[in-house]
C-alpha cells in the first residue's frame, strides 16, 4: 500500500507531549536499579542554540536513551550557566535588566532544546542565577572559608579595562581578555582566592585514575599543574653592588646540573629587589612599569620580544665565589612562579640563548648528547635542552645530567651561607591559587561583610542568601554594587556597627564547578543531600568541548575535593568518563575580495556543479561567490546554520542523525546540504518501508528465523544489534549509523516482499523481529521516528520505555573461518570454508584453489597438515 510521507512537524511535537505527560524521563532517586548519570556541559543562555549544541546534546541523549533501554536508572538533567558579562553588556547596550535578558533567553533556548526531543529530566532544571542556587553556593563558600580553603590577599591581577573586571591567568589569551578581546592591564587589588594549590599533588596523582578521559586532556591538566623537582639556591650578592638589606637572591631551578653554564640571573619586575631598585632609579622604575603592562599568559611571554635591564648587581656563583654574574630585570620572568628569579644557562634554554645573544652575554655549552664530541660540540642559534653528558663543568665533566643534578644538590645542601644551607631540595608547582573575585554585578555575591572594628566577617548562614538588588543601573562601566548605598551599607553581624558588604561577586567558573552535584537533589535546603550525591557521583559520562580541558574541568575537580573536605560529598572526582566532541564546521562564502569583500551566509547562496567543479552563486542576483575554506561556524564570517531552520525544514530526527553520522564524534563534522538531505532521505525511506509493510507485520509474531529464507534476515539484524550495542558503548555513533544504513538496505527487499503479501508466516515473523530491532537501535538517535514506527507496528507502549533487544548467540556466530594456506611454510593463499568442515573437505578445498594449483605446478604434495580452524600447510 502507498503511505503518506513522514511528517516531522506533526509527529515530533506529538511524541514530545506524550513523553512529557508520562514523565518518563523524570528520575526517581529511590529507584533500586543501577545508576547511570550522563551530563552534557550546560549552556550559557545567549538566546539561541547553535548547531554545536545540537551535536553535543544529541550525543548525550543517545547515551541517556541507550542506557535507559539497557535497564539503568538514568539521570540526564539540564540547566543554565547564567551569570556573566554578556548579560551586563546587553543591559548597557539595550537598556534591559540582566535578569530579564537572561530569563527571556532561557525561555527561548528551553523551547529550542525541547523541540530536539531530548530525554531530559526538566523537573531538576535550574539556572545559576536563581537565588535558590546561588544561596547554596554562598553556603559552600562559607564552609570553605571555615575550612581554610578561602583567603584574601593583595595581589597583582589581570584587569580587563573594557569589562572592568579581574581575569584569571587562564582567561588571558595572547595578552587579551578571553571575552572582550581587550588588552589586559596589571593592577594591585585585594582579591579572594580558593586554595586549589592545597590539592596540587592529589589533582596530579589522580589523573592516572581517570582511565575514561582523553589522554590529551589529562596531559593538558598535568602540564598546567606543572609539578617539578629542583633546588632553591641562594646566590650571595657581591659586596657593594646591591641595595641595603639584601644579602642574596634565591633562585628555583630544575637544572642545577647546568650551573657551570650560568651566564646571568634574571628577576621579575615585581621582585622585592626590583622594587627596591625602582625607588632610586627612574630607568629601572620605567622598565618595570613596561613589563607590568605586558601580558602574563604563557603565549604572551613566549611571543613577546625578550627585554632586560642590567641592574648593576652582581652575585657570586654558588660553586665558585670568585665568579660573579650580572643580575637583570627581564620581562619574561614572573613573580608568581618559583621565586620570581631565575639563573640563565643560555646553551640549554632557547629563551636564555636569545637573551644572551641580544645582550652580548657568555654562552658556554655544558651538556652534549651522549654520542657527542666534547672538543667540537658548540651551540649556535639553537640551544641544546636534552639530556646527555656534562662538559665544561669542572668536577661534573663526564657525568650524566641526573648524576650531575645529584652531585650539585649534595654539595649545595651541605654548604652554608649565613648559617643557612646554600640550597634545599624543593618540589614546585606551576598551578596557582584560583582568584575568584570579579568586579561586576551579574554574579554570585561573596557572602562577607567588612567592619572597621571586626575586620572581615562571614555572613551568618541564617542570613543567606545575600541577594543581588534589582534596582541597579548600567549607565557607566564598573560594578553597580559599588554605587548602591542601601545594599552596600549594612550593620556588622558581630558588633552591630556600620559596615559594608563585599561588592565583588564570584567568578562564573565557580557556578559551573559544582552544578553537577546540585542536579542530584536540586530541592535540598543545603547544597547537597550527601547520601544522594554520593549515590549519583561521579558523573558516568560527561560530554563537552576540549576548550574546557583546564579551566572548568580542573576547577570542578578541585571543587569536588573541597566539598569532600566540608562534608557535602564523599567522592573526590566529579567525572568518571569524559568525552570531548568535535565542532560543527562549514564552508565560507565571500563576495568580492580585499577590503571590499563581504561574507555571505549559506542560506543566501546556491551551489552548483559546473563542468565538474563546485561553484556558488547569490540567490538574489546570480553573482558568483568565492567558496572559501571550511572553518568553525562564526557570526563574523556568516557561515552559521540556524538550528530552527533545520528543525523546521527537516525535523529534529534528521538533524540529530546527520550530526551523529558524518564523522567520528571526537572530530569536526562538516555541515553540508547534501549531508542533511541524505539523512532526510533515510528517514523517509525507513518510514515508507516500515509503514507499507505494517498491515502485514502487525498481525505477525516477532520471531527470528533459525533456518529457511528468513535466517539471513535474522542474522543481519542480530549481528547489527550486537555491533551497534558495542559501538554505542564506545560512543562510536558514526559507526552505529553506518551499520543502521546497511541494515535498512538489507531489509528493503524483505519489507517490500512482506508488503506485497508474498511471504510465508515464518519469513514475516523474522522480518517483523528484524524491523523491531531496527526501530529500537535507531530510537536513541531518531526517537520520534522510532515511536511512530513502533506504534504503526501495533505496540501500545512507547519504544522509549522498551528494553534494549537481546541478540541471539547462534545468529551472530560466524559459520565460516578464514585459514591461511602455506606451502613448505610460506603463505600462498587463504581458504574460506565452513567452520565444521572435516579434514578431507579442507584438504580438497585447498587443492582446488587457483593460487595453490599455480604454486604446485603439477607436483603432488607429500602430505597436507590441517590444524582445524587455524592453518593448512602443504609439504612438497
Swiss-Prot record:
Q: Which family does it belong to?
A: Belongs to the class-I aminoacyl-tRNA synthetase family.
Q: Which GO terms describe its molecular function?
A: aminoacyl-tRNA deacylase activity; ATP binding; leucine-tRNA ligase activity
For the protein in the UniProt heading, the enzyme class is ligase
Provide the reaction this enzyme catalyses.
Answer: tRNA(Leu) + L-leucine + ATP = L-leucyl-tRNA(Leu) + AMP + diphosphate
Matches recorded under SUPFAM superfamilies: Anticodon-binding domain of a subclass of class I aminoacyl-tRNA synthetases, Nucleotidylyl transferase, ValRS/IleRS/LeuRS editing domain
- The species is Allorhizobium ampelinum (strain ATCC BAA-846 / DSM 112012 / S4)
Which Pfam families does the entry mention? Anticodon_1, tRNA-synt_1, tRNA-synt_1_2, tRNA-synt_1g
PANTHER family registered for this protein in UniProt: LEUCINE--TRNA LIGASE, MITOCHONDRIAL, LEUCYL-TRNA SYNTHETASE
Keyword Ligase among UniProt keywords: yes
Instruction: Please give the name of this protein.
Output: Leucine--tRNA ligase
Gene of this entry: leuS
UniProt-listed Enzyme Commission number(s): 6.1.1.4
Q: Where in the cell is it found?
A: Cytoplasm
